Amino acid sequence: MSYNAPVKDMLFVLKELAGIDTVAQLPGFEEAGYDTAQAVLDESAKFCGEVLAPLNVEGDRNPSSWKDGVVTATPGFGAAFRQFVEGGWQGLQHPTEYDGQGLPKLIATPCIEMLNASNLSFALCPLLTDGAIEALLTAGTDEQKQRYVPKLISGEWTGTMNLTEPQAGSDLAQVRSRAEPQGDGTYKVFGTKIFITWGEHDMADNIVHLVLARTPNAPEGVKGISLFIVPKFMINDDGSLGARNDVHCVSIEHKLGIKASPTAVLQYGDHGGAIGYLVGEENRGLEYMFIMMNAARFGVGMQGIGVADRAYQKAAAFAKERVQSRPVDGSAKQSVTIIHHPDVRRMLGTMRALTEGARALAYVAAAHSDIAHRHSDEATRVRHQAIYEYLVPVVKGWSTEMVNDVASLGVQVHGGMGFIEETGAAQYYRDARILAIYEGTTAIQANDLVGRKTLRDGGAVAKALIAEIGDTVAALGKLDGAAAASMKAQLEMGARALSSVVDYVLANGKQDPNAVFAGSVPYLKLAGVVLCGWQMARALLAAHANRAHDTAFYDAKIAIAQCYAEHVLVQAGALEASIVGAKGNESVLALTEDQF
């Protein structure tokens, strides 16, 4: 199936909700306003629709392959990757001083959504490279930045993130890979890393692995982990590639989805030690890796949004073609396309509402990141960075849970045909399943939301956002119509529910952590439901204000916002009850280990 990027919807969010014109007033972004965004998004849509989308099914049916340590990408991926990097897409949001485009994250984010929607397996490669670039720009030496970043931006080299080991999944305190210092300032790295996305492939000349390992006599646990650059090929003084480093791919995984993305098992040091270069200071590796991880977590949230939109497009197209049964209201005597049936409309409306809400929240988060990095006032930068950091686990956790629901509904709209691989709906369902797992499971995102993002600041950011929601509720009260009334009622209830849960977390987080963390995922889901609902409410307000300019488009925005209010926001009260009303989640903690 073809992919038609929803550029008009994206531009609506950029202008009306995320504030592209405000971002364009930041130092260095003066030329990156609405017109620039429109031009970039149009080109991205063309590339993703014409080049990447046709390869999506091919990658699923003819995935990357491994033989004797060599990984060969799906046919067509290499040529597509060359077009991608030659078009400057890898460097879209990276600094011009390293040959990037220097555009705001706010403009890059819709392009990333398109990449994910058109071909998720392909999009994973530039995602990890983006993370490597961010980590090196933040923690690398000037020499490391000059040596690696331009090549990563140009796409001549790609990047990876090496955390996981057979015994160390989410618990990085268990990392055993070791790095032994040499007399020349380098280290020899030894160990096994698993689940390394695009850890070996033939699409680029070199691969820059960022590897967590322990130096001799390092402290126990996460405080004794350091970060190292380990290139696949050594780099000569003149920048040319030298001998193969002692890192080898011993296998790739056979997966439920994202089959074209090679998930590698990498062995370091089987032949004397892989040469590595310390990033920053010893024992601060996890701190530096979190730079990469936070970039990746936001990116995975965008994967959820992209795949959700693709699943929605597929389901809507099928519903307009599939003829089954007469309408229940008797308006026709013959069978009609299934989009005429109320429950199909409910499923499609829910899919679209969830996707548009998640998209809006993610784009707004991207704008906060841009302001945090570029605003001239330090206090403003700090405030927007805090908001962005609060939103990241919600964007990652909520969007990736959401896409599992949306992709499942997409299969359901297809009926029995959705269970057949040839129709394509099943691929989105399979591809989506990993998104709530990798780069930190939903529970890890929820724990972050509770611990670092709510308890640590006394709920300051959460309460500030809830106050802003109150302003939106007040604005809704000035509008006529059923949609505004419904949204006002549900958003007001949702804000009260979120406020209640934040207060509960603050009151019980230290004295009864088991109870609070048993409700952490419902808290994250509640935050997602309410914060996305807030953005849908703002979309409704903007649609009312602009309705005369494009009645059909803005009426659809109003209707989808009402759908969100009545089918998604209504869940807020139940989520609150499952946390606050569950008496410390006694039922969750009641069974003994043997009773499970």
Where are these regions (language model features)?
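Amphipathic, small/basic residue-rich leader segments at the start of a protein or domain
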Residues: M1-A123, R147, S578-F596
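Acidic, low-complexity proline/glycine-rich segments
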Residues: M1-A24, A274-N283, K314, K320-E321, ...
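Glycine-rich cofactor-pocket loops
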Residues: G28-E31, R61-A73, R284-G299, Q313-R352, ...
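Internal maturation/activation junctions in enzymes
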Residues: F77, L128-T129, G140-Q182, A366-Q385, ...
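C-terminal amphipathic alpha-helical interaction region
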Residues: Y98, R456, T472-F596
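Alpha-helix capping/hinge segments and adjacent helical runs
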Residues: P181, I258, V364, A386-A464, ...
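A short core secondary-structure module
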Residues: T186-R244
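A glycine-rich, basic-preceded beta-loop-alpha segment at the flavin cofactor/substrate interface
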Residues: F195-T197, I235-V250, K255, P262-A296, ...
